[in-house]
């Protein structure tokens, strides 16, 4: 018997309610203004760094990807880096600028191609927000014309690297506890779930099978904490319908005729996606129903585009 669950808050409203008490605890008695002086922007020939009293984040000037995240209290490195990198689309950095704004350190990256802009904002309390605007123009400019997305979209979003060896588990709010595919979402229910890391390969694992499988796509993210003895962090969704991809499941080595049982996963290790692929069963995807088919993107002048907004807590 499956008990259905339904969300009663949009992701951005839920996030607002979650952050208010945390920010109040971080700055009691109106001490926010005092902390603001500790937030600043630093530049070298190759890097732009956003620094607060709690967290320091450095970006490459060449492509606006994260090169390092440091927790200032203990100097610990959080190895989420080498992103955001486009998945299912193309984007090329056109302009990069940094500034102070209302006490926050802000980095604004503008792109040609499928992405319009990604704005990073580091608040004095150490929370880092990412606001991405995607697919809001019919022409990507700079020779892209409209050829800046995959013809058939399997995965669409942004991806980062994070070493699998650092992760011991995940606690998250969203659909769970099982991983999903585009045509395997019903049955995964909203809730707060916990999974310890495992590398279960159904049909092949010789050791004890541990379920739910840890790696894969997770639907309707509200927040997730990647647990680690050395480098934990939490990410919150401020946009609805985001899929969280966690690492890449291994294919069974003894699969029939060596054929892959799963569609290709995005590059990187941790991805935030607006679309994911279906998984086939006996028949090719082209012979499955409409909910299994790859996405097709059509953009018209005046479209608002898609938003992929996140908040990272590295403290």
Predicted regions and their residues:
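Short beta-strand elements
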Residues: 1-29
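Beta-strand/loop-rich accessory regions of lumenal/periplasmic or secreted enzymes
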Residues: 20-315
């Amino acid at each position: 018997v499956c008990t259905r669950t339904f969300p009663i808050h949009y992701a951005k409203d839920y996030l607002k309610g979650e952050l208010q008490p945390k920010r109040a605890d971080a700055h009691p008695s109106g001490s926010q203004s005092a902390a603001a002086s500790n937030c600043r922007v630093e530049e070298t020939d190759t890097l732009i760094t956003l620094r607060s009293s709690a967290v320091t984040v450095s970006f490459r000037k060449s492509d606006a990807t994260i090169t390092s995240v440091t927790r200032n209290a203990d100097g610990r490195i959080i190895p989420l880096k080498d992103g955001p990198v486009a998945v299912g689309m193309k984007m090329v950095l056109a302009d990069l600028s940094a500034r102070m704004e209302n006490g926050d350190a802000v980095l604004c990256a503008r792109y040609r191609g499928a992405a319009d802009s990604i704005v990073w904002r580091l608040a004095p309390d150490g929370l880092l927000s990412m606001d991405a605007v995607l697919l809001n123009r019919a022409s990507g400019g700079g020779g892209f014309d409209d050829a800046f997305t995959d013809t058939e979209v399997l995965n669409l979003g942004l991806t980062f690297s994070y070493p699998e060896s650092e992760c011991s588990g995940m606690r998250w709010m969203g659909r769970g506890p099982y991983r999903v595919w585009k045509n395997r979402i019903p049955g995964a229910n909203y809730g707060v779930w916990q999974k310890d890391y495992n590398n279960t390969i159904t049909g092949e694992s010789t050791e004890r099978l541990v379920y739910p499988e840890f790696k894969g796509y997770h639907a309707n993210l509200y927040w997730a904490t990647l647990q680690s003895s050395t480098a934990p962090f939490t990410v919150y969704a401020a946009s609805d319908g985001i899929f969280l991809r966690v690492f890449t499941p291994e294919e069974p080595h003894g699969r029939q005729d060596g054929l892959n049982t799963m569609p290709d996963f995005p590059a990187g290790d941790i991805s935030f996606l607006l679309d994911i692929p279906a998984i086939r069963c006996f028949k090719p995807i082209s012979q499955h129903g409409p909910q299994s088919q790859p996405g097709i993107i059509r953009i018209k002048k005046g479209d608002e585009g898609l938003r992929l907004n996140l908040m990272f807590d590295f403290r």
